[in-house]
């Protein structure tokens, strides 16, 4: 089956002179760090083996009580603070995740409750590591169709609870965390083209079912299996290098731009070799690609919004800059979007005003399995806190 892509540009929705732009951003990662040296004590591996093959040196691990919803809620609260708005100013909450707290209720609904929102529609979206690009496109469509003015777009994962910690080919790759943005509708002034138009310029999405079981998590209703990540690494690598370059190129072209006109690329943080391959394939310099996977590993749908939040804090984006995000994931799926940055990076300081203790996610009576780290990691966390 040949792979088909869909995409869109500003002005293709029901309100032709409306686009969207990012006005708030934030992220949350657990305090507990699992280094490659720590992993040497869990599985047969080494820091040298992991670093040279992936670029990952450490990853963050959720402790007891930290969940996809709790991290997503904190990231979202910071994004709201940066945007200078309240939870009830938001019309839509979309959470991209493959590790929800529960099958039902959705993580988005739990986050809505934690934020104190009373009016937003809320739902989860599953497109694996491409999830944030998909969620962005959905929120963009919602807003440009005139269904609302603002959306929270969140990517959040606790992959440490979906990893087989005896499988050294996968357990070294993944980490936990969450990132969020506030996306707002923006009217386009007459006569603006891609060279000057603010906000979202294009997006590109694809799905290829030929790789459905090259990267997957069993354990669905009626499956009867443990929900642990399984991956054909070689097959996934080939797909990732091919599709990320193709999707990024398509999104940039759809925006009416060339790679030379893009100021920053923020890729899904899966593997440094994949990122370097994409850099060469689209003839784009590595120094203009934001990389933080050495600190966090692969956080799936959370990787792009975490990287975006850190890129702004690092001074890598200023008003007028064009950036492109690109991702691939299980399914297979892939996605990219191109945006011209317009927000004041100094607004990021507002995130510090959020009191984590004020953001509480409701839990079921007696707790839930989603609240607990795997036993092998709990022992590690216990030693760290002695």
Regions found by a protein language model. Name each.
Residues 56-60, 89-94, 113-126, 160-166, ...:
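Glycine/charged-rich beta-loop-alpha catalytic/anionic-binding loops adjacent to active sites
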Residues 2-64, 167-242, 246, 341-386:
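Condensing-enzyme catalytic core mediating Claisen C-C bond formation in acyl metabolism
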Residues 142-178:
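Flexible, glycine-rich active-site loops centered on histidine and acidic residues
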Residues 23-26, 96, 126, 151-157, ...:
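Short beta-strand segments
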Residues 43-52, 102-116, 153-159, 217-222, ...:
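Acidic-glycine-rich active-site phosphate/pyrophosphate-binding loop
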Residues 82, 86-118:
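Anion-binding (especially nucleotide phosphate/pyrophosphate-binding) glycine-rich loop
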Residues 88-96, 259-268:
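Short glycine-rich phosphate-binding loop at a beta-alpha junction
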